[in-house]
Amino acid sequence: MANRLKEKYTNEVIPALTEQFNYSSVMAVPKVDKIVINMGVGEAVNNAKTLEKAAAELALISGQKPLITKAKKSIAGFRLREGVAIGAKVTLRGERMYEFLDKLVSVSLPRVRDFHGVPTKSFDGRGNYTLGVKEQLIFPEINFDNVDKVRGMDIVIVTTANTDEEGRELLKGLGMPFAK
């Protein structure tokens, strides 16, 4: 079963971007390389159970097992020791990446309260886009009754685009609702 977002990319986005930026080859057209979802769980220093719940929610959202991230160095002000588990992250590529992006754009983002589009200023200068989500409840897989605490996450969409403008047009073509 082919993903509808991947088909849209092949049939609509590639020709549109080729025409707009005058690419000589189809391989020069930017594409989404990977999506990294990161959940920093600061409370995990005192309570390891919160990290387990956050990792389970991340696994539900992404469809694959998250990697537990550890503190690189000790910070006394945060009562943090080097090597203590403080977060979870998932790197999505290929089919799962397109499924997640499709779900994010068509289902999850419209469920955000007072949503007027995602900010256009969140590009990093190399065509990659970073999006912060304040609550995990916008994803349909998360059961509202089982949530112990509202947690946010960072979603980084890494593209092969060379400039922010190319990256913006790529994501706009894939249906990302940018603010006017």
Swiss-Prot record:
Single GO term (MF): rRNA binding
InterPro entries with a match to the protein in the record: Ribosomal_uL5 (IPR002132), Ribosomal_uL5_bac-type (IPR020930), Ribosomal_uL5_C (IPR031309), Ribosomal_uL5_CS (IPR020929), Ribosomal_uL5_dom_sf (IPR022803), Ribosomal_uL5_N (IPR031310)
Superkingdom of source: Bacteria
This protein's GO CC annotations: ribonucleoprotein complex; ribosome
UniProt xrefs under PROSITE patterns: RIBOSOMAL_L5 (PS00358)
UniProt family annotation: Belongs to the universal ribosomal protein uL5 family.
Name the record gives this protein: Large ribosomal subunit protein uL5
